Amino acid sequence: MEINLDYSRLLKEARAIRPAAGTPTLRIALLGDCALQQFLPLLRALFCRASFLAEIHEGGFDGTEFAALNPESALYRFEPDVIVLLNAVQCLRDKYYLRPGDASDFANETLSRMTRVWDSIRRHSSAQIIQSNFAAPIERIYGNYDLKVASSLPASVARLNLRISEEARSRSFVLVNDVEHLASWVGRKDWFDERFWTLAKSFCAPELLPLVAKNIVDIILSTRGRAVKCVILDLDNTLWGGIIGDDGPQGIQISAHGEGEEFHRLQCFLRELKNRGILLAVCSKNEHANAIAPFEQNPGMVLKLSDITVFVANWDNKAANIERIRQALNIGFDSMVFLDDNPFERNLVRDMLPEVIVPELPDDPSDYVKAISALNLFETSTRAAEDTQRTEFYRVEAQRQIAEATAASFEEFLQSLEMKIEVERFVPEQLSRIAQLLQRSNQFNLTTHRYTHAHCEAMMNDTEYCLPLSASLSDRFGDHGLIAIVVARPDVVAGSLEITDWLMSCRVLTRGVEEYLMNRIVEEAHRRGLGRVRGEFIPTSKNGMVKDFFARFGFEKAREDADGRTEWALETAAYTPRHVFLQRVGDISSIGA
Amino acid sequence: MLGTYMTSDIEGRVNEVFQIVFDDLDLMVGRQTTAKDVEDWDSLTHINLIVAVEKEFKIRFTTAEVTNLKNVGELIDAILRKIG
């Protein structure tokens, strides 16, 4: 996997964009105190690579506050999905130099102007805000002593960056574009090109603008279904040094100090990813008994068998094994990263499974983590309490599959699960998980609207016109957590309940959850005196599995567009509730308005 | 009017940079060519042009040089001064 970020190459790509009909569009407003025009072709080209069409509104130079504070501004008329705020440290430096008094309040005042912009945007728009932080400046007035002088420019910028992070933590609608990371990664003496700041207010050296654009695009795509969900690991010379079949479980190199320290460090990094909610799988050409031995016997191993969701060790080709892992987890190839020290295996997987992300690994294992980090593969825009349990969810799922295999019939299996389901209106404590599911679900997703946290909150509060429901499932093996979202809107005039969104985690398919939810939706329409339920299906490249969802429940197709969109309607009187093995938790009235 | 077409090696390389930056493989510039003569040569593409020329010849212009270049001839002279 190589990401070409050559400046002139991207400009050329931008000129060649010819979007196919039906390419999903993103409306992006770009505001800042630097040259914004330069970013437009770069953002367009990078979004085009990800199969999105970017409609970009370019704010006036240094016009962020004007646009954000005025509800009538062109910014809000544009109705952006995302508002990108870029603040250059060069501009901050000018303001610092020209400050009227002393600089003791400079950072605080700058911060309060920023948060005022964010909070004003929040009042007038549901757009996601992406705020840049500051590259540390190159000027030193006191030398190292700068950091001991709270009012110095370097100390002010350091404090400001810290405060930006803190303020963003308490606002789910603000994500941080970590420009300081990019500048340090490249090196600040190359990052800053003062000639182009002087001449054109260029945010950084022009050849490095693509890095900033990529960072912005990575963040936005993470709000639009792009997420790495699983890292697949080779073992010999990837996860440890040496060959387990030759060296034995105690002979391989893996220890916190001394031989194999670089592998130890990689395993620590992977364990952090796993704790964050990214699944780990093993795909190794080995005898299974040999492959698992170090996990059980070598005390230097950081990763334990319980950290690995799917463990495949055999002599089949790796593409076939990755397909098995994909089936076991029910996730897309494009959400899988494959790490292998062997270029032959990497190329084979790239060839046979081009969607799988296969980073080029350097020859020296000491550089693995650096090479992986450089790609920024693990971007996310949400974090939910359930993330930490994800490995456990899948592990328990494996036990269910064993139960299924041993049950006399599928019905008996479902019955034996003793499933309990709770359906309720969106509640504040669940909004993070709800927004996450909306942003990550690609396959079982009827309309793929990517609502922001702010949108979800607005739906939650709209008790008159919106019925936003979430469902949580548990059974005798354990908790599945919040696994389905259905949003319906009563239309009293038309006498119908309109299903605008329906999505589910693929962990819980074929358990009867969708049947249960449809029963509840029809019941709810009845209760409100609405004689009809209507629904829509919007095709994407990934949601083919639910193309016939409404037909399954006896809906009639009311309309079909050339782009494959379909509309469906069901007379509630004609609906026979589906038989399910789910027990209701909570009160039916909990979902009513 | 484009004036005299370039023939020397440096001039040929400069012309290729123009063709890439302005995405026009038929573009021919000469010493007398100015921003007015080339479609899309604005302040933004000027920066792209300078970045591309610097990369091609592994040189670095000063701010004043970037600002004061009046035509392609002056650009070529500036390149020659730096690599000469």
Short names for language-model regions:
Chain A
Residues 29-31, 132, 234, 283, ...:
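Short hydrophobic segments within beta-strands
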Residues 230-232, 236-320, 379-431, 435-439, ...:
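Alpha-helical substrate-recognition element adjacent to the catalytic core
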Residues 328, 350, 354-417, 523-593:
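Terminal substrate-recognition subdomain of acyl/acetyltransferases
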Residues 476, 482-561:
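Acyl-donor binding region in acyl/amide transferases
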Residues 322-343, 349:
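Conserved Lys-Pro-Asp/Glu-containing loop-to-beta segment of HAD-superfamily phosphomonoesterases
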Residues 1-59:
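Serine-esterase "nucleophile elbow" of acetyl-processing enzymes
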Residues 122-128, 277-278, 355-356:
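A short helix->loop->beta-strand "cap" motif at the edges of active sites that frequently abuts
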Residues 18-25, 42, 50-59, 64-207, ...:
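Alpha-helical cap/lid subdomain in secreted, periplasmic
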